Amino acid sequence: MTTPTPTTLKHHATTILTTLVNDRQTAAIEHLLHPTITLKHNDLPAMSKSELIAFWPEVLAQSPHFRVQIRDVIAEGNKVWVYSRVEGRLGEGVMDDFHMMVFDEEGLVVRSTGVQRVVEGEM
C-alpha cells in the first residue's frame, strides 16, 4: 500500500467529522479509525475506539441540532488540523472547533485531540 497523500488525509479527517456530526452515522467511520486509537477532547475523558462508538450516539441523542461546518484543513506529514464551527452540541451555542489528528501509514487515525470554545451563547 502507498503512503496516503496529504489530500487523502485531509479527506479522511473531514469525512470523520461530517459523518459523525452532520450525517449522524457513528459506525460509518469505524474503518478510518485505528484499533488502538486514542481520542481526547477538552471536556471529556480520553476514549478508545470502542468507547467512542458506544458513547457518540448518546451525544447525538442529546444534541438534535448538532451541526459542523468545516472552515479550514491543513495537512503536514501524517498530521491534519481541522478548524470548524459547530453548533448545538449538548445545548451549547456556536463554537470554534479544532481537531488535531495523527494518521498511520495506512491512513488510519491513531490519535485525535479536539478542543472547542463557545463564541456565541447557548441555544
Curated annotation (Swiss-Prot):
Top-level division of the source organism's lineage: Eukaryota
Principal EC category: isomerase
Gene Ontology biological-process annotations: ochratoxin A biosynthetic process
Protein's organism: Aspergillus carbonarius (strain ITEM 5010)
Family the UniProt entry places it in: Belongs to the aurE cyclase family.
GO molecular function, one term: isomerase activity
EC number: 5.-.-.-
Protein name: Probable cyclase otaY
Taxonomic lineage from the root: Eukaryota, Fungi, Dikarya, Ascomycota, Pezizomycotina
The protein's role, per its UniProt record: Probable cyclase; part of the gene cluster that mediates the biosynthesis of ochratoxin A (OTA), a mycotoxin composed of a chlorinated type I polyketide dihydroisocoumarin moiety linked to L-phenylalanine, and demonstrated to have nephrotoxic, immunotoxic, genotoxic, neurotoxic, and teratogenic properties. OtaY is probably involved in the polyketide cyclization.
Keywords noted in UniProt: Isomerase
Metabolic or biological pathway, per its Swiss-Prot or TrEMBL entry: Mycotoxin biosynthesis
